[in-house]
């Protein structure tokens, strides 16, 4: 019987699972939409929703709790300054999971997990900024 077992193991150790979900949470908070497997998306949703609720609290202790969980201070600043105020009047339900077919390599069920009222320009914004910075570095080196 599987009574009392919470979550999935994903054939990973506890530390690997913890870091995997921290990395997924950072990606989701940065891009506001990611594509992952359906079971990972289902387990990621309560983690990120709790982080957004901490962000809505807004005090120093909540900020330190979020930093301890995901370890990326730039994303924590974005969570507290941009994402949490957007959901100030919403009590939970910040994320949606949409099924996205099956992956070709192993036929795994895929899903898109995104914020409900997401900023559509946020997806890939960090990558665009990085590419522009690399472009200016390459131009400066060539000159």
UniProtKB/Swiss-Prot annotation:
PROSITE patterns: RIBOSOMAL_L17. Residues 124-133 have a biased composition (Basic and acidic residues). Residues 124-143 are annotated as: Disordered. One of its GO terms (biological process) is translation. SUPFAM superfamilies: Prokaryotic ribosomal protein L17. Keywords: Ribonucleoprotein, Ribosomal protein. It comes from the Bacteria. GO terms for molecular function: structural constituent of ribosome. One of its GO terms (cellular component) is cytosolic large ribosomal subunit. Belongs to the bacterial ribosomal protein bL17 family. Part of the 50S ribosomal subunit. Contacts protein L32. HAMAP family: Ribosomal_bL17. This is Large ribosomal subunit protein bL17. The lineage of its organism: Bacteria, Pseudomonadati, Pseudomonadota, Alphaproteobacteria, Hyphomicrobiales.
């Amino acid at each position: 019987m599987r009574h009392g077992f919470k979550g999935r193991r994903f054939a990973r150790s506890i530390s690997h699972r913890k870091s995997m979900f921290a990395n997924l949470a950072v990606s989701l908070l940065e891009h506001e939409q990611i594509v992952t497997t359906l079971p990972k998306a289902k387990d990621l949703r309560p983690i990120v929703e709790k982080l957004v609720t901490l962000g809505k609290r807004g005090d120093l202790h909540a900020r330190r709790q979020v930093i301890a969980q995901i370890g990326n201070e730039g994303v924590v600043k974005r969570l507290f300054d941009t994402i949490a105020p957007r959901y100030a009047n919403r009590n939970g339900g910040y994320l949606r999971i949409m099924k996205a077919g099956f992956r070709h390599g192993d036929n795994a069920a895929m899903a898109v997990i995104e914020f409900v009222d997401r900023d559509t320009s946020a997806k890939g914004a960090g990558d665009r900024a990085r590419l522009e910075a690399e472009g200016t570095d390459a131009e400066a080196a060539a000159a």
